[in-house]
Amino acid sequence: MALSREETARRYGTAIFDFAKDSGKTELMYSELTELKKAVQAEPRFVQVLSNPVLDAKQKKSLLTAVEQGFSAELQEVLNFLLSYDRFDNLVDIIDYYIHLYNAANHIGTGVAKTVLKLDEDQLQRLADSYAKKYGLQALHLENEVDPEIIGGVVLEVEGRVIDGSVKHRLEKIRAMLTK
């Protein structure tokens, strides 16, 4: 029975996290996997080629060897492992699960800040630091989404929690109070 994408990501992501933990390289693996994910998203053909059943294992290995030279021995071992089990089509999902485990182990949150105007890096970082401090996180990685419908303010969505500080939400609350 074939594994679902989610189950494959969970199993392999957990195995990679355990491997990195045992070798004391979780942070190094995190940074390298994050960089690899960015590269793969910028050039998705890389995964398509290494997942292509038409290419034989020797061709795939030579392509991978050319790419992995800038990475640590541990990540090279992981990439060769994934290649040997034909799991490169799940690479981004596996990396995402590793990042999820790393963030959970290090009390790092991820989320989205919706605003009317794009926040600069300093504003986004101050917002993330404030939220992290309030909710006991070591750090918070926020992405900024522009949503003109909120009129003003900020809507934070972090780890399943929503804090709606938007003008739209405040107006809806006032409208509800007035109609009672």
UniProtKB/Swiss-Prot annotation:
It is a peripheral membrane protein. SUPFAM superfamilies: N-terminal domain of the delta subunit of the F1F0-ATP synthase. Signal peptide: none annotated. Keywords: ATP synthesis, Cell membrane, CF(1), Hydrogen ion transport, Ion transport, Membrane, Transport. GO terms for cellular component: plasma membrane; proton-transporting ATP synthase complex. One of its GO terms (molecular function) is proton-transporting ATP synthase activity, rotational mechanism. It comes from the Bacteria. Pfam families: OSCP (PF00213). InterPro entries: ATP_synth_OSCP/delta_N_sf, ATPase_OSCP/d_CS, ATPase_OSCP/dsu. It is found in: Cell membrane. Belongs to the ATPase delta chain family. F-type ATPases have 2 components, F(1) - the catalytic core - and F(0) - the membrane proton channel. F(1) has five subunits: alpha(3), beta(3), gamma(1), delta(1), epsilon(1). F(0) has three main subunits: a(1), b(2) and c(10-14). The alpha and beta chains form an alternating ring which encloses part of the gamma chain. F(1) is attached to F(0) by a central stalk formed by the gamma and epsilon chains, while a peripheral stalk is formed by the delta and b chains. F(1)F(0) ATP synthase produces ATP from ADP in the presence of a proton or sodium gradient. F-type ATPases consist of two structural domains, F(1) containing the extramembraneous catalytic core and F(0) containing the membrane proton channel, linked together by a central stalk and a peripheral stalk. During catalysis, ATP synthesis in the catalytic domain of F(1) is coupled via a rotary mechanism of the central stalk subunits to proton translocation. This is ATP synthase subunit delta. The gene is atpH.
